[in-house]
């Protein structure tokens, strides 16, 4: 959305009544470009959100919330530490409860009258490992995570390249392995992984994960699976010669 040459990217941004608005670029069926990432996760992991109560942690403009609703979710708790970004349309949707200026690590059951069993997550400047235990406790054993994994916020400064971009596929492998190894420490497991169809800021390759309660019926993701996934992601998104 543009006013003249100025890009409008926040719902809270003020414009004049006489300003002419222009929509540029390819049409997106969701409230943000990020929705395309969760869309792939739902397809890849065969997620069924019909009738489910979901938490969208790191809701921002509402792309993930929009995907949940368009895939049949009964209600979405949209949670974000920021404010003023969330889609006006979604903000006024009775199926959405919006918590702005809210730290997901401080969520308590009394804040969520409807019991969520699905968490979708897209967070920045924090590791998902700090949020998984809280959300897992809120959802209980029937819960499932569909999360975006941003290596640039998982790896630590010593493993990140210039301008916050990770180019080394080995670092991507390490990050995914560390998350898969972390899940069992809270009684969960990394069940499936894929890569995001679009890059993040600066051209960062990002990944998608399905994390569920640990059972004997499902096999966790192995290092070999991670290696092949990262290899494919680099080939598809960067033309890397990762071996």
Name these PLM-found stretches.
Residues 1-49:
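S4-like RNA-binding module at protein N-termini
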Residues 151-168:
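Short, glycine-/aromatic-enriched active-site segment of Class I SAM-dependent methyltransferases
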């Amino acid at each position: 959305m543009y006013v003249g040459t100025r890009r409008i990217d926040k719902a809270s941004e003020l414009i004049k009544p006489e300003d002419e608005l222009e929509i540029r670029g390819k049409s997106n069926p969701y409230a943000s470009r990020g929705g395309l990432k969760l869309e792939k996760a739902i397809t890849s992991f065969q997620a069924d959100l019909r009738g489910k109560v979901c938490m969208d942690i790191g809701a921002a403009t509402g792309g993930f919330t929009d995907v949940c609703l368009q895939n049949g979710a009964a209600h979405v708790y949209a949670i974000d530490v920021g404010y003023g970004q969330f889609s006006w349309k979604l903000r006024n949707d009775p199926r959405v409860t919006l918590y702005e200026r809210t730290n997901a690590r401080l969520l308590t059951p009394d804040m969520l009258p409807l019991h969520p069993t699905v968490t979708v997550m897209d967070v920045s400047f924090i590791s998902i490992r700090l949020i998984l235990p809280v959300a897992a406790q809120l959802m209980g054993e029937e819960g499932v995570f569909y999360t975006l994994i941003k290596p640039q916020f998982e790896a630590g400064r010593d493993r990140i390249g210039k301008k916050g971009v990770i180019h080394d596929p080995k670092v991507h492998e390490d990050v995914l392995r560390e998350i898969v190894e972390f899940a069992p420490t809270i009684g969960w497991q990394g069940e499936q992984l894929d890569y995001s169809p679009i890059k993040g800021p600066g051209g960062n390759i990002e990944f998608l994960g399905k994390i569920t309660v640990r059972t004997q019926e499902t096999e966790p993701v192995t290092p070999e699976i991670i290696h092949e996934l990262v290899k494919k992601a680099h080939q598809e998104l960067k033309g890397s010669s990762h071996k």
